[in-house]
Amino acid sequence: MSAVAKRTRRARARAEEAARPGSTGEKYREMSVAEFFAKNKELAGFANPTRALYQTIRELVENSLDATDAKGILPWIHISIRQIEGSEGRGGRPRYTVTVEDNGIGVPVTSMAMAFGKVLFSSKYVIRQTRGMYGLGVKAAILYGQMTAGTPVEVYSATKGSQYVYMMKLVIDVQRNEPRILERGEWNKRGSWHGTRVTLSLEGDWSRAKSKILEYIKRTAVIAPYAEIILETPDGEIYYFPRSTRKLPKPPRESKPHPHGVDIEQLKSMLRSTRASTLREFLVKEFQSIGDKTAQDFLEKYGLDPDLKPRELLKKGRDKLLRRLADALMEYPFRAPKSDYLSPIGSDIIEIGLRRMFNPEWVGAVSRSPKAYRGHPFIVEVGIAYGGGIEARSEPLLLRYANKIPLLYEEREDVSYKVVSSINWRQYNVDFPAPLVVLVHIASTKVPYKGVGKESVSDVPEIEAEIRNAVQEVARRLRLYLSRKAREEEAIRRSVTLAKYIPEVAVSLAYFLRPPSKWQPPKPEEVKKIQEALIKIVARHIELPPVDGKTEDPEAIVRRIVESVELE
């Protein structure tokens, strides 16, 4: 028997032995990623029909926004939710067809099947700020639809500059984690449309999910007032959120990893894929915040050979040297990560969104300077709106966002809630119940979510401190506004006390400004002349503080009061 045949026979024997129950009677087998998430759908936010319908809308809308504003395109997003009549699922639960269409960059036809049919296949596995992180969301929705409605996902897409519109109907092969295409087509593009339209069916509960879905869309419109969003509901309602600004945040850019954010496994992967011929070249080419001089100083400090070939660190017997390099990268005081890769919303856009949605009497926002945690850059932005159309509540209405995603669930688990609820708002002249809205946005190449459902952010000390500083910074401006407003109201109250007597005093003076022998009812023009003089005298003695940069005319206030008295 040849050596090859012997090896094949031994391999077959090992495979048969592995498939047989062991001494414990247990069988072992491999589970694909798709099968794992199909069996543990609650991990991705699909715990029940209510949450599943909400999560499906959220995942598709986030993909649309990433494909538009992140590429400098003013977003147009159309969402349709329709109940499928006579197709109740398990337990009589209704089924729905969800369609989301956008005007984004589209998906290349060569990637369409994998992008929608393979779990953890994504364009987001780079160091860049995106709404999605795991390459899971839309595939989790497709899996849930397969399991509850038994229908494929239908995708139409056209990229910018393409002459064709492509269509695919596919399902995910759960055992193999591969797309199975059921139908495909392509058509000549008649217009200039580019973007993606995704349609899938699933079990859901619209009556329970409605409030969350509407709130999600409203909060998306707050954070993205540059987007035009249309929502058609199963109730026959159409919600339209027009674009209120054409100003877009700057698109995010891909960045190199920072040395403080790299672990041993990531370092191994980088060493395998690098084209650098020396360790010094590897450090300069593959990391941010490392130039030639920094690389030389770093290698000298830790006694590492600058001419060592990177792949030498992956050979047997080099484990200690590899760990030494990884520890040194974490320890050395490199420059902070660059933040120009991030895409903050900007204080102007935050204020536009809050004004449009809440019509407040005062609004302020701040976009803080970049900071970093564990080698990952982040920017905290905060907006506060007060009064006007805001309903008074026993605590602030908190709007949480991470990489422009509205976070609606798990509020009390979030670091933003921890900070906002711990602030003594009375120090800022806010007494509850009060009409107060606080918006917190965290932009980062790696948001520290508490789970794959992306609903709450961990209380990382650096992020917590920045949120607190940002909230307090805007709250101080609110306090200044409220203090000036209180002084103005007090001045107006005093003005009312004086001004309401002006008509009566004017008539009396008209009598007494002539000798007693000529007393007679004064003429209206005489009273009017004296009244005008009194209005100017009283107005000169009223000092109104500027409120939100504006000062009301004291004379106009006195005149309004006098006119109201005359009408009584």
From Swiss-Prot:
Annotated positions binding ATP: N63, D102, S123, K124, G132, M133, Y134, G135, L136, G137, V138, K139, K454
Family annotation (SUPFAM superfamilies): ATPase domain of HSP90 chaperone/DNA topoisomerase II/histidine kinase (SSF55874), Ribosomal protein S5 domain 2-like (SSF54211), S13-like H2TH domain (SSF46946)
ATP-binding in keyword set: yes
UniProtKB keywords: ATP-binding, DNA-binding, Isomerase, Nucleotide-binding, Topoisomerase
Swiss-Prot/TrEMBL catalytic activity: ATP-dependent breakage, passage and rejoining of double-stranded DNA
Gene3D superfamilies cross-referenced by the UniProt entry: 1.10.8.50, 3.30.230.10, Histidine kinase-like ATPase, C-terminal domain
Disordered: region residues: 1-26
Basic residues bias: start-end ranges: 1-12
Enzyme class: isomerase
GO terms, biological process: DNA topological change
Single GO molecular function: ATP binding
EC number per UniProt: 5.6.2.2
Keyword flag ATP-binding: yes
InterPro entries the UniProt entry points to: HATPase_C_sf, Ribosomal_Su5_D2-typ_SF, Ribosomal_uS13-like_H2TH, Ribsml_uS5_D2-typ_fold_subgr, TopoVI_B, TopoVI_B_transducer
Pfam families, alphabetized: HATPase_c, Topo-VIb_trans
UniProt subunit comment: Homodimer. Heterotetramer of two Top6A and two Top6B chains.
Function as written in the Swiss-Prot or TrEMBL entry: Relaxes both positive and negative superturns and exhibits a strong decatenase activity.
Family assignment from sequence similarity: Belongs to the TOP6B family.
Identification of the protein by name: Type 2 DNA topoisomerase 6 subunit B
